[in-house]
Amino acid sequence: AEDGLCEQIASCGNLLRNYSVFQLPAIDHLGSRVATPLLMKQASSVSRQYGDGSVLSETFGCAGWGVTFERLQWIWGGQSVLGITKPCYHLSAYSIEGRRKRDYPAFYSYQEPWWDEFKSFALWMKNLNTLITEGERELHTLVIPPREGITGNYQDGAHSQDEIKRLSAQCRMLAENLLDMQVDFDEGVSLLGGTSREEQVCPYVFYEMCINSNGTYSL
């Protein structure tokens, strides 16, 4: 999945519902950056709610030939803290001759001069992932994003692209503000269940507080 709510709705509809039937939810994290928290949160939330908490990330693509271990550590740390547990390096190539060397580098293979030292970084990733997955994440807040309402209206042509972009920005801001206040949360959909443990469909987690995002119409 890509970062923006607009792109997700146009191609996937309600991505959270789709993730719920995945054996291993996954994201595509591109660039020398840490993406909006929604990209990581939507996959890690569904994995906690329906599975074992494992989430795959195709990562480090487009980080550039000059990327450093420190930069890679920052990129992966930003994903791990939001629930990503398994890396899939982007990419490895049989050859980087000619134009191949321009195919969204860096390449995480023997062509890199630092390849022999990469195992130390990989060990750090492994240890960090072990630390995150051995414990049990404790959070009490569920955020219902506006995907369901927007998807229905988007298909009917009732929402303009500008309005969807506005709702997407508000949803991203809500997530960033909650994390800034150190309020961890999951994303979810209304089909998760009711207001008691007996009513909820999802057997793995129970939330004490639910926040409906602006644009959530279908509850």
Give each language-model segment a name:
Residues A1-L219:
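Carbohydrate-binding surfaces of carbohydrate-active enzymes
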